[in-house]
Amino acid sequence: MGRSRSRSSSRSKHVKSGKHNKKRSRSREKERVRKRSKSRESKRNRRRESRSRSRSNTASRRERERPASPPDRIDIFGRTVSKRSSLDEKQKREEEEKKAEYERQRRIRQQEIEEKLIEEETARRVEELVAKRVEEELEKRKDEIEREVLRRVEEAKRIMEKQLLEELERQRQAELSAQKAREEEERGKREELERILEENNRKIADAQAKLAEEQLKIVEEQRKIHEERMKLDQERQRQQKEEQKIILGKGKSRPKLSFSFKNPD
């Protein structure tokens, strides 16, 4: 009982330890996932901060590049001129900047298209040149290539013929082995049949010999029985004769009695 309790307690401990290990592995996996998500979030934040900084730097650079706004103008009556003109100038500058940016982007796209066309044309010309060079080289080495092709064809034919002959030889050997196995099997069957026939003949001969012995014994017994019967018949006849003599000796006037016994078959 004590051993069973200790075993059950050790098993429960192993089960509990396995559960704790699973919980620990799960908690570690969750911690790894949290760390990965935090690192990804921090990377995203850093990217956003860098983008915002670049945007702010660009805006500040544009502000610095812009010319200083002129001071407020005063008309002849001593009143400040409306800021509408300055706003118009600002809007005009922005439109000019947009146009300049659009023109710059257009030039970049145009340049990219031209570069792509040049690259495609260059690739086409290189391909044509390579094809032409290959054709010229093939034309120069036509005879050599034909000889090499013929050599390889002949070599392939020799290899195929050799493989075919080897395959035919393997098939022939396999057929010979199968035929030999069949002959061995047939020979074994014949030997088994001959053994069975010999065994049957031996059994028949033994049975015939036993039957002949039994017949001889029966004949001998019959002969002995016949001899015993003959002896008994002779003994009976002798006794009958003696009895007749005795009877005749006592009374000679009596007629003779004749007795006869039938021999049993």
From Swiss-Prot:
Superkingdom of source: Eukaryota
Q: Which gene encodes it?
A: arglu1
The free-text domain remark for this protein reads: The N-terminal region can bind RNA; preferentially binds 5'-CGG[AG]GG-3' motifs.
In which family does this protein belong, per the annotation? Belongs to the ARGLU1 family.
Q: Which UniProt keywords apply?
A: Chromosome, mRNA processing, mRNA splicing, Nucleus, RNA-binding
Q: Which organism is it from?
A: Xenopus laevis
Q: Where is this region: Necessary and sufficient for transcriptional regulation?
A: 67-265
Span(s) of short sequence motif LXXLL motif 2: 193-197
A Gene Ontology annotation in the biological process aspect, one of them, is: RNA splicing
| Protein name, per record | Arginine and glutamate-rich protein 1
Q: Residue ranges under compositional bias (Basic residues)?
A: 1-54
PANTHER family tied to this protein: ARGININE AND GLUTAMATE-RICH PROTEIN 1
